[in-house]
């Protein structure tokens, strides 16, 4: 089974209708995998600047320009980009699934932040 994150990335570079509808709601922090997060950041940056779908070649070039990536990560990210082939997916299903994924990730991250804040407060209180 394909991960939703990978399916999202594939469609962000191949499906303009999907991109326009979903990119305003997807945040880079929703991606758990650092390589997927980098690819999303490059997609978002390109779309924000040029208002067009980026190609795999453009993404690879942009990743190469980053100074926050080591050689092993670069190889992994460029391999990930090379695997982002177009595959037909029913658009409405994909949008619904992406919306659910965004909600789930936002809730998870909010809960995680709350737990961390509670731990910090508990550990810094003086009795």
Task: Identify the meaning behind each predicted range.
Residues 1-101:
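Noncatalytic partner-interaction/assembly domains of nucleic-acid and motor enzyme complexes
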Residues 82-127:
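Interdomain "pre-motor" coupling segment immediately N-terminal to P-loop NTPase/helicase cores
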């Amino acid at each position: 089974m394909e991960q939703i994150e990978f399916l999202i990335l594939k469609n962000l570079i191949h499906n303009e209708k999907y991109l326009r509808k979903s990119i305003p709601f997807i945040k880079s922090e929703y991606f758990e995998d650092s390589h997927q997060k980098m690819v999303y950041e490059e997609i978002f940056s390109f779309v924000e600047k040029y208002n067009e779908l980026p190609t795999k070649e453009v993404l690879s070039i942009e990743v190469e320009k980053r100074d926050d990536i080591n050689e092993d990560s670069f190889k992994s990210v460029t391999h990930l980009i090379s695997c982002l082939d177009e595959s037909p997916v029913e658009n409405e299903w994909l949008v619904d699934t992406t919306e659910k994924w965004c909600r789930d990730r936002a809730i998870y991250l909010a809960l995680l932040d709350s737990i961390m804040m509670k731990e910090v407060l508990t550990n810094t209180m003086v009795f």
